[in-house]
UniProtKB/Swiss-Prot annotation:
Keywords: Cytoplasm, FAD, Flavoprotein, NAD, tRNA processing. It comes from Mesomycoplasma hyopneumoniae (strain J / ATCC 25934 / NCTC 10110) (Mycoplasma hyopneumoniae). It comes from the Bacteria. This is tRNA uridine 5-carboxymethylaminomethyl modification enzyme MnmG. One of its GO terms (cellular component) is cytosol. Pfam families: GIDA, SAM_GIDA_C.
């Protein structure tokens, strides 16, 4: 790597600011493209840390992690190596919403990533704080740090999470700090404001942690799980041998009384917090106020590491003062003698308005500047990692002079996530839900590999050989489906007796029945589950694919980049405002902007058609 004599500055292809889940994925994506990268982080021992729950996956989120893996990312691989428990969620609700969730040894996870990154060529890890982006003629060319270092690069990816001008809040205390007592980065926040970026205040929180030795496990319910032979990563061979349990208990009437009596002491309810919190992960104070009719709320004890010395108290996120936290904790069965290892807190921070972004996650204002993760208004490790991977891919494409990679809504939850952010924006921490995806029957846990394959190949994150291997897998499934359609079970066969068949039926039709175990028909076929899902959902899949094609046609209708929306006749005032702010690239994007109605789209289409006719008439 070439060093410049002035200011000890160094030239790189890309700089990644922040070593959280988004930053790590961005780094790996860039390294896979053979680019020279510097990662600037506050503490390299806390790479991809888990300051909130020690888990990866869950409804929709687990599918995102599978997509990250299929796209060439690393979250799934490292989760498999660090997991202490893994399970399926929503098994009874069908394959469209089936997802994986794993408890992670958070310390091991960070150590594995640091160890692996130390082996990587073309990577320099710096412990520092970014103070200023270097921008000239609306293009980023490097940055300065708090330690007076200067780095030049062709692109910069900001993945600062909840650290920008962040405050940790507990009771009446408001301390300038990042999560886990780390330094806040108000210098970068102020710099972004000076560059004209629109920032907003958001809030999240975390519960207290309890020393395991102080818990009375005789008063709580132990989660008993089978040993699932599953992984996040399609490539992983690591299997968990023993499931470490979580535990369930509940709040009590006494818990609720203490919270109600002390609401005014909560940072959230005292007016100390101005940021908007996550709708789908409310604090215990919010639960008691919003759901006052409920006599109790679930509380889960989740081990933070394999040592199991500290438990994360899921469901008890709070910004109460320490004395109130201790008082309410002791009213929960199993925690009467609890000793708190770390008190809960709320954290308020600056986040970018994601309408400032293109679908590539490059900013509209500054070329070569990309944003990913919680800085874009999302919540969750999985959502952050997905954005980091996409930003890393597209920063690499930018450096190499190639077109950006943009994942469509019908191809992945990652596509839904980014499309929602850049077309609708968000005023609260955005969490991925299966209900946000209109094509969720085709965005399943089992088929993430084939859905992401073309994007991974285009990105250069998988080889042509790996791509063809995935294609061969599904070709094999298609051939087996054809075979089963030609093979029949008669009423005299043993299989017919097991399932009370009264007439001859094809094996394909039989396997599509919900009560049939596919292993009875395909005992040795390695992709039996995938085939069964395809057989059972065939009609629904065809319908959603047809609907997706309509969406794709709208995506192909481009909107001129210099279009003057004020000249579009009969647009609603809200549509005009949103179009000018978002500046959608396609009619498809325009149609998904909140507040835009079908009449606005018709007016826009008509205006573009007139412009095209005027151009033709001038020729």
């Amino acid at each position: 790597m070439s060093k410049k004599s002035k200011n000890s500055s160094i030239e790189f292809d890309a700089i990644v600011v922040g070593g959280g889940h988004a930053g790590i994925e961005a780094v790996y994506a860039l390294l896979k493209k053979k680019l020279k990268v510097v990662l600037i982080t506050l503490d390299k021992k806390k790479l991809a840390s888990m300051p909130c729950n020690p888990a990866i996956g869950g409804p929709a989120k687990g599918i995102i992690t599978r997509e990250i893996d299929a796209l060439g990312g690393v979250q799934g691989k490292f989760s498999d190596l660090a997991m202490i428990q893994i399970k399926y969620l929503n098994e009874s609700k069908g394959p469209a919403v089936l997802a994986i969730r794993a408890q992670i040894d958070k310390e091991k996870y960070s150590k594995l990533i640091l160890k692996d990154l130390k082996k990587q060529e073309n990577l320099l890890i710096i412990e520092d704080l970014v103070s200023e982006l270097l921008v000239e003629k609306n293009r980023v060319f490097g940055l300065k740090t708090a330690k007076k270092q200067v780095f030049f690069s062709k692109t910069v990816i900001i993945t600062t999470g909840t650290y920008m001008d962040s405050k940790v809040l507990r009771g009446s205390l408001a301390i300038p700090s990042g999560p886990d007592g780390q330094q806040t980065s108000n210098l970068l926040s102020n710099n972004l404001k000076r560059l004209g970026f629109e920032l907003q205040r958001l809030k999240t929180g975390t519960p207290p942690r309890i020393f395991t030795s102080s818990i009375d496990f005789s008063k709580v319910e132990k989660e008993v799980l089978p040993v699932y032979n599953i992984n996040f990563s399609f490539q992983s061979k690591h299997k968990i041998k023993k499931q470490i349990s979580c535990y369930l208990t509940y709040t009590t009437a006494k818990t609720h009384d203490i919270i109600n009596k002390n609401l005014g002491k909560s940072s959230m309810y005292s007016g100390l917090i101005s940021g908007v919190g996550p709708r789908y992960c409310p604090s215990i104070e919010d639960k008691i106020v919003r759901f006052s009719e409920k006599p109790r709320h679930q509380i889960f004890f989740e081990p933070e590491t394999k040592k199991q010395d500290i438990m994360y108290i899921n469901g008890l996120s709070t910004s109460m003062p320490e004395d109130v936290q201790l008082e309410m904790v002791k009213t929960i069965p199993g925690l009467e003698n609890a000793k708190i290892a770390k008190f809960g807190y709320a954290i308020e921070y600056d986040a970018l308005n994601p309408l400032e972004l293109k679908k590539s996650l490059e900013t509209k204002k500054v070329k070569g500047l990309f944003m990913a993760g919680q800085i874009n208004g999302t919540s969750g490790y999985e959502e952050a990692a997905a954005q980091g991977l996409v930003a890393g891919i597209n920063a690499g494409q930018f450096v190499l002079g190639k077109k950006p990679v943009e994942i469509l809504r019908n191809d992945g939850y990652i596509g839904v996530l980014i499309d929602d952010l850049v077309t609708k924006g968000t005023k609260e921490p955005y969490r991925m839900l299966t209900s946000r995806a209109e094509y969720r029957l085709i965005l399943r846990n089992d088929n993430a590999d084939i859905r992401m394959a073309k994007y991974a190949l285009k990105s250069g994150l998988i080889s042509k050989k790996e791509y063809l291997k995935i294609k061969a897998k599904y070709a094999k499934i298609d051939r087996k489906i054809l075979e089963l359609s030609k093979e029949f079970v008669s009423p005299k066969d043993e299989l017919a007796k097991k399932y009370n068949l009264e007439k001859r039926i094809s094996k394909l039709k039989l396997i599509s029945w919900p009560n049939v175990n596919f292993k009875d028909i395909l005992p040795d076929f390695e992709f039996g589950y995938e085939l069964t899902v395809m057989a059972r959902l065939k009609g629904y899949i065809q319908k959603q694919n047809s609907e997706a094609q309509k969406m794709i046609r709208l995506e192909k209708l481009l909107i001129p980049g210099d279009l003057n929306y004020e000249k579009v006749a009969n647009l609603s005032s809200e549509a005009l405002d949103k179009f000018q702010k978002v500046r959608p690239k396609t009619i498809g994007e325009a149609s998904r902007i909140s507040g835009v109605n079908p009449a606005d789209i018709q007016m826009l289409l008509f205006h573009i058609k007139v412009l095209k006719m005027q151009k033709v008439s001038k020729i």
